């Protein structure tokens, strides 16, 4: 189901302690528990995750949904940024894969709640 979702909702905890959900384009997923997204180094969510790596990620497809909690790592590694670079990123990062404002967010789930075919399932990931 995650592979069918181009957009996920990523939630950070803002400076006032409130959840801050934002829609994000998914760049890559490894199974269901690891999701990669790109963003700006100067974005509020990047600031939030540097101060508190706890986050949430949700996605939805055809009436089914998955909501996960986990940790988010801000990745600045040049090789990973190059590997995950997509041509349309140039609209946001004119310097290309080496643009200093381009970073990757890596979400790693530790718990998931599924709503699949009318049934709730909670599990550790």
Language-model features, listed with the residues they occupy:
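A short, Trp-centered hydrophobic/proline-enriched beta-strand micro-motif
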Residues: 1-15, 55-58
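General beta-strand recognition
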Residues: 9, 34-36, 67, 113
